[in-house]
Amino acid sequence: MHNKILVSSYILLVLLFSLSSFNIVVAKDGDESGNPFTPKGYVIRYWNKHVSNDLPKPWFLLNKASPLNAAQYATYTKLVADQNALSTHLQSFCSSANLMCAPDLLPSLEKHTGDIHFTTYGNKNFTNYGTNEPGIGVNTFKNYSEDASVNSFRRYGRGSPRDNKFDNYAPDGNVIDQSFNSYSTNTPGGSGQFTNYAPNTNVPDLRFTAYSDQGTGGEQEFKTYLEQGNSGGQSFKSYGKNGNGADSKFTSYGNETNVAASTFKNYGQNANGENQNFTSYSTNGNNPQNNFKNYGVGGNGPSETFTNYRDESNVGDDKFSNYVKDANAGEANFTNYGQSFNEGTDVFITYGKGGNDPHINFKTYGVNNTFKDYVKDTATFSNYHNKTSQDLASLSEVNGGKKVNNRWIEPGKFFREKMLKSGTIMPMPDIKDKMPKRSFLPRAIAAKLPFSTSKIDELKKIFHAANDSQVAKMIGDALSECERAPSPGETKQCVNSAEDMIDFATSVLGRNVVVRTTENTNGSKGNIMIGSIKGINGGKVTKSVSCHQTLYPSLLYYCHSVPKVRVYEADILDPNSKAKINHGVAICHVDTSSWGPRHGAFIALGSGPGKIEVCHWIFENDMTWATAD
């Protein structure tokens, strides 16, 4: 009996020792908690299996794996098999998986009397709020929607004469979605004021539908609206339509924005005696896009004024379709219009046609304008800048190999290879990642979700994305870019899991690979000094795979092969103290022959396609792959 107990104890000790050893091995191949059944644990094992070298693991990549724990991973893998089931658990899924999803806003039917002040609010739906509210007063929104994504104002202030003020609304937001539907409709008087609305935002989507429709008197003012915004768009549909004696003012609207789009549809249509003023609109912007359709059509005595419109911008396009058509009297004035540094395009189609004695004046306006079907007898054109081809070349092209008009290219964004020498002092651009923080989906979940433009309706249903929402636009844009045919000589793929990225990189470069990124953002937007520097693969011309983030609910990268490059690693020093502040990765494109002649690199550096190499830093959270040394 005693011997049996000893044998049993020995077996138990062996089993315990074996399990302990097993746990130690698993911890090496699992996530930081040592659990091999998490998505991150699987990605680490996948890296070990598919990458042939024993170099240190790229934790900046592996840490982008899904943060789901083992139980959550099992639950959502089961739910994704039934997309309706996943959709019903969307908010918990997005939160657990670190995705970017719009919140589901519940309608607000609350009533109030007196003046109401909203301070530091966000993610709220105002439906029927302030409807038919009597009396004179004001409702204010101050510091509203800071760092928030979605707000909806539906039938807000309908039939009420009260004033509404939005002060410092949605500042510094990322992928914000703000909608105003039937706002201040049928109002007798009252005013709306948007001051410092959505400044410094990244990819905003701002929508005003039937705003101030059938209003009487009152004034709607947008001051410092979307200033210094990046990309995104604004749409005004049926704004001020059927109004009576109302005024609208846009001052410093969209100034210093980057590739922002504005659409005005049925703006001021059939209005009586309305005044519309655009002052300093899209000034100093980079490639602003503005579209006015059915603007002021059928109005009675309208007054439309554009002053310093798209002044000093870089290219950009404006289109006016059916502008002030069938209007009775009234006037439209364009002063200092379209004086962009680099030539843009302005198209006027059916301008003032069918109107009764309209007065249309263009004073000091830019080149490359097209006027079709306008009232010649009542349109006045003065001081038209019809620049010669030589003048245009001095503005938008390279003249004599010198750098010209690089105000829209951030200092240090592009540079020559000779700058990558120890001791060089040079500017570094803003390399900070502007995208919202997200994680990869586990491959097992990503593979079961639709991912094509043909199934976009299914995706919108899963992610609760309304047809006109920013999330729906974001999904559509990403899928279209992913399905775009590759450029000549390019191999490309969109990857929404870490495993897919590993597969693509190794398919192009082989299994002996290294992935690199710039260590941090120190030195960004200032001068830096180059410290020690190393050329990857001996500094020889090589091939790499570059991966750049794309805006999507989950982390999504656009990866493509980049032939004929040289890749460098460099210590980045503070130019004053000489202390190391960063470790940067730079890539130099040796062959630029397929680049366009108006590429920002040539505007900043001079020369043209195929004549020079062009270098740039790898920005935060972007990465480049190369074969290991």
Swiss-Prot record:
Signal peptide positions (record): 1-27
A GO cellular-component term linked to this record: apoplast
Domain of life: Eukaryota
InterPro entries according to UniProt: BURP_dom, PG-associated_BURP
Propeptide boundaries: 28-109
GO terms of biological process kind: cell wall organization
Comp. bias regions, Polar residues: 267-293
Residues bearing carbohydrate: 125, 143, 255, 277, 333, 368, 386
Location relative to the cell: Secreted, Extracellular space, Apoplast; Secreted, Cell wall
Entry keyword tRNA processing: no
Limits of the BURP domain: 414-628
Renumbered residue ranges of the record's region Disordered: 267-305
Keywords assigned by UniProt, alphabetized: Apoplast, Cell wall, Cell wall biogenesis/degradation, Glycoprotein, Secreted, Signal
Parts of the chain that traverse the membrane: none
Record's subunit section: Interacts with polygalacturonase to form heterodimers.
Purpose of the protein: Non-catalytic subunit of polygalacturonase.
Protein name: Polygalacturonase non-catalytic subunit AroGP2
Organism: Solanum lycopersicum
Gene designation per UniProt: GP2
